[in-house]
Amino acid sequence: MAEGFVANGQWIGPEEAEELVDFEIATQMNEEGPLNPGINPFRVPGITKQEKQEYCSTMQPKLQALRNEIQEVKLEEGNAGKFRRARFLRYSDETILSLIYLFIGYFRYLVDRKRFGSLRHDIDIEAPQEECYNNKEKGMTENIKYGKRCLVGTAALYLILAIGIIIIIRTTDAQVVWRLPPLVVPVEESEIIFWDCWAPEEPACQDFLGAMIHLKASTNISNTEGPTLGNWAREIWATLFKKATRQCRRGRIWKRWNETITGPIGCANNTCYNISVIVPDYQCYIDRVDTWLQGKVNISLCLTGGKMLYNKETKQLSYCTDPLQIPLINYTFGPNQTCMWNISQIQDPEIPKCGWWNQQAYYNNCKWERTDVKFQCQRTQSQPGSWIRAISSWKQGNRWEWRPDFESERVKVSLQCNSTRNLTFAMRSSGDYGEITGAWIEFGCHRNKSIRHNAARFRIRCRWNEGDNNSLIDTCGETQNVSGANPVDCTMYANKMYNCSLQDGFTMKVDDLIMHFNMTKAVEMYNIAGNWSCMSDLPTEWGYMNCNCTNDTSNNNTRKMKCPKENGILRNWYNPVAGLRQSLEKYQVVKQPDYLLVPEEVMEYKPRRKRAAIHVMLALATVLSMAGAGTGATAIGMVTQYHQVLATQQEAIEKVTEALKITNLRLVTLEHQVLVIGLKVEAMEKFLYTAFAMQELGCNQNQFFCKVPPELWRRYNMTINQTIWNHGNITLGEWYNQTKDLQKKFYGIIMDIEQNNVQGKKGLQQLQKWEDWVGWIGNIPQYLKGLLGSIVGIGLGILLLILCLPTLVDCIRNCIHKILGYTVIAMPEVDGEEIQPQMELRRNGRQCGMSEKEEE
């Protein structure tokens, strides 16, 4: 500065004025200053010296104040004044912008790196020496303040999002009970099984429809093998027979007597039989039992009440068995005949004892053989009789009938039959609860329809080698002089004609009662007059037991009957109960597990829709488990209609009610209350399995059974992978026990409703109290959703304010500076040399064009 100005200390020239104005503008360049700090008039482009002089005169007081302000500040390295503050602000802004430009540039490089090519040059740029500023110099700027707020807000936002994700995940896991569960489990000991029969257009079975028998299973949930239908063959058989002959036993009794039949050595070894014989009306037999005699009625046994059948051979689940051919009387040939000759090997009391009291031979090593034999019979008219055209009394339809004089008992329907192969029968002890003389065989024979005869089936008995001595029992074998035995040849030779007859009666033992059916007048209705023939039509799955015969050499003191041949066919004492049991052994009685299987598809629904879907499946399973399979509405058909389910709990109730109306289920008041309870207390109610899982295995509502993957069946006793209890450290038995406790609580509410009031007022009040106590649990997701939404909205607003406002302010400020052409000028460095004040003032004075006199 000029020496004259320093000495005077009052006048400031254009050169000094320009620096002072720069200082003023620089001091205003901070975050607290105005958006437009102003311009330096001495730096306006095109300004003249005259104009600068005028500015000096006009701004002299302001310039004097600025000079005094500068003189008050010590310009040292440790205190750079407001110029140092300005440089800090400028450098901080440039640092932020540099980071932004670096991020944008690197992002652009990642997007277009393929277009840039593989050649890259790394350039080392020396980092400039930066000034260091302490916290006191930095102070609390707007950038620092908003940066801290941004950090806190962002951390809070991520924390809230993490909490929300955890809540959603935990809620989803609670609804997934078991992703790979057993489809069925064995029934337990205390359970009652309801069963029914099903045969299309069969009067005996239709009459039986609706009747139920209570059966108990002796098994535990931990057992891998549960009871089979064969365990209840006796009950099933007795019920079927009694049901089929119910009207017969109510009809007119022809004859009744009691008799005791003893063996050759008295009643030793339980060889006595107490017989009470009832002869019912033959008309009943024609209507109800005729076709059953030939074993041609296909009957399926069905389980109700939520029980199912697992076929251990085909690995299939079903509600009913395959069609079964169940004959009501003894047959030489029958399905899976199981008679054993050696009494010592028989453990099951239901298996008939085929031993004989006076034989040395015994049969063992029996093998089942299918029937590969045919019997052909023909009849030639031999008895007198008349042909008339009449309407049958037992069937409304015109047909030919032969009406001889039955009262004279002179009529005997005789036939000649032959076999297609040699059949050697084993020894016997007795016939159909009575003695049949000679060698014998019984079989069914089918007559085709012709011009004079309609189609019919007959029961034919062939006998040969009948002895004359009635005191001796005709016995298969060749050994002579056996006490009480008449040896006969029991081989039926192929293509040899034997004299046979239509069976005119039979006896049937039901429990301890032996019933005799007189078929004399029933045979009349077959239209047997004239010449006709028939052919045996044994089912392909029927057969006989072919056994080896061995002579017992342990006791030679008494002469006994020896083996007639090396092999023999077991024929006597075919037990229909044993045959039925063996047909039913492959069906294991199982039940549906006590939980709800949620398919993976449902788990992908939105939370509200997912809860509604589970509600619907729970309600359907609850009602269907009470209704059972006998109503015609299977769980498969009902659940599959609603697996794309519904929105709210109320809508779920309406849809379930509609489904029940469609399937004609009687929805009484109590059942409706159970349905509503099932929806409201699913948190404490047992989870029910539905046939929804079957659909996942490829079933639909039109299928009555479906395949079960073997690996699922084998793993039904496995340890649960993940449950809502104990993170999977629980066995199936423990799972079942826990669900049983919940089930008891659920049924406790139902029993309270049933015992206190038909309308269930008290039970519903308790249920409403329970709902009031725990109702807020169901609203937690809704509350969390609203709270989370509000927090997220506020957080995003704060975040946008923190991030955008400072950047926007700086952007506007920089843009205005660029437009106005303003550039920040840093304070010039002060030299350490001492400046002569007089010379500096004089220089400045001459620059302003003043003389020394004017200066004085």
Swiss-Prot record:
Highest rank taxon of the organism: Viruses
Posttranslational modification: Specific enzymatic cleavages in vivo yield mature proteins. Envelope glycoproteins are synthesized as an inactive precursor that is N-glycosylated and processed likely by host cell furin or by a furin-like protease in the Golgi to yield the mature SU and TM proteins. The cleavage site between SU and TM requires the minimal sequence [KR]-X-[KR]-R.
Immunosuppression, as annotated region: 662-680
Parts forming coiled coils: 643-693, 736-772
Name this polypeptide is given: Envelope glycoprotein gp150
Function: The surface protein (SU) attaches the virus to the host cell by binding to its receptor. This interaction triggers the refolding of the transmembrane protein (TM) and is thought to activate its fusogenic potential by unmasking its fusion peptide. Fusion occurs at the host cell plasma membrane.
Region (Fusion peptide): 616-636
Species assigned in the record: Feline immunodeficiency virus (strain UT-113) (FIV)
Annotated site residues (Cleavage) in this chain: 611-612
Gene Ontology cellular component annotations, sorted alphabetically: host cell plasma membrane; membrane; viral envelope; virion membrane
Signal sequence annotation: none
Cytoplasmic compartment spans: 807-856
Subunit structure: The mature envelope protein (Env) consists of a trimer of SU-TM heterodimers attached by noncovalent interactions or by a labile interchain disulfide bond.
Taxonomic lineage: Viruses, Riboviria, Pararnavirae, Artverviricota, Revtraviricetes
GO terms for MF: structural molecule activity
Entries under Pfam families matching the protein: Env-gp36 (PF09590)
InterPro entries: Envelope_glycop_lentivirus, GP41-like
